[in-house]
Amino acid sequence: MFDFLNEKDRQPPALPEGTVRRRYSIEGQVQGEGFRYRARYAAQSLGLTGWVENEDDGSVTLEVQGDPALFLKLFALIQRSDYIQITSLRQRDLAPDPWERDFRVRGCW
């Protein structure tokens, strides 16, 4: 009756071949400039999933999942703003999340 309650018991959905999940720590002029919302729009337009969040130290963390060939396009779309300036980018590969279905902005009302 309430199958969603037993979701942990279900098999995870299959991911497209080549799916990668990557976490980026981004520094520069990235807070207060619309970075998170630009990232969400760009990720959604490219069919990527994940999340983006401001950090207390002024950096932004972006976790993205999908075709890694699209990750460079994602950053190109984000940087089309005159206000956003990325000065440092660190990345770390993670295990893909088969349950994730969208891209979210974290830490907002």
Where are these regions (language model features)?
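Intrinsically disordered, low-complexity, mixed-charge
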Residues: 1-109
